[in-house]
């Protein structure tokens, strides 16, 4: 896949794709019959100019996929949002590669932040799970009002409101870099821990056999 597409951090050169990306996000949501918060071309351009977006390009430098980073609660939480792949390249594994790249971008720019996402797509849930995200309750997400305001343009916003923001049709998933680091350290410690010598019972058994 990496040989077919260039997956890079977006910049000013890629703002020309913003309108196409915005329209494709809306079109994709309508086709799936699921909700998605709308993102204007201007908003997408801002993310590109801030260095908070990843774009996938074909060999001819045409747009193939996109995803961006948002921060909430003063940088304590990061969301990788707006994952979209051009229709002709779907089911090719490109979405997984884009998510991997944007995860790397997020953990590099915000190493202490918790990463989260909300999605109704089974494919995205599978990708997130493979990358280390885990399903959580909405209470574990950011309480930043600006984040939840972004859900207003979703067709399911009334459901979210009626549930007092405790749940909705989206599945919440969380990636905590600190927890992942602790698990890695503990695993390495276990592997490096020297094996204990024979037990007392084994020693006595050996001595008994020698005296036979």
Question: Where are the model-predicted features located?
Answer:
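Terminal substrate-recognition subdomain of acyl/acetyltransferases
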Residues: 1-3, 107-112, 116-212
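Conserved acetyl-CoA-binding loop-helix of GNAT-fold acetyltransferases
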Residues: 85, 91-106, 115-117
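A conserved beta-strand-loop-helix scaffold within acyl/acetyltransferase catalytic domains
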Residues: 22-88
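Short beta->alpha linker loops
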Residues: 13, 39, 119-123
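A short beta-loop-alpha structural element at the N-terminal edge
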Residues: 2-20
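Short amphipathic alpha-helical segments and helix-helix/interface helices
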Residues: 44-45, 103, 125
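Short Gly/charged-rich anion-binding patches and loops
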Residues: 56, 101, 123
């Amino acid at each position: 896949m990496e040989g077919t597409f260039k997956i890079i951090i977006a910049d000013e050169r890629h703002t020309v794709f913003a309108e196409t990306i915005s329209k494709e996000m809306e079109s994709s949501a309508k086709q799936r019959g699921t909700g998605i918060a709308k993102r204007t071309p201007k908003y997408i351009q801002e993310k590109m100019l801030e260095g908070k977006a990843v774009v996938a390009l074909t060999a001819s430098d045409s747009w193939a996929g996109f995803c961006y980073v948002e921060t909430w609660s003063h940088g304590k939480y990061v969301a990788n949002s707006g994952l979209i792949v051009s229709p002709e390249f779907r089911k090719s594994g490109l979405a997984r590669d884009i998510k991997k790249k944007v995860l790397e971008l997020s953990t590099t720019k915000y190493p202490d932040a918790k990463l989260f996402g909300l999605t109704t797509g089974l494919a995205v849930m599978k990708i997130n799970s493979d990358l280390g995200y885990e399903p959580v309750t909405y209470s574990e997400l950011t309480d930043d009002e600006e984040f939840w305001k972004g859900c207003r343009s979703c067709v399911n916003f009334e459901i979210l409101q009626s549930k007092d923001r405790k749940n909705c049709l989206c599945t919440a998933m969380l990636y905590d870099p600190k927890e992942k680091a602790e698990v890695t350290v503990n695993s390495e410690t276990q592997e490096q821990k020297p094996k204990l010598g024979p037990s007392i019972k084994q020693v006595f058994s050996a001595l008994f056999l020698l005296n036979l």
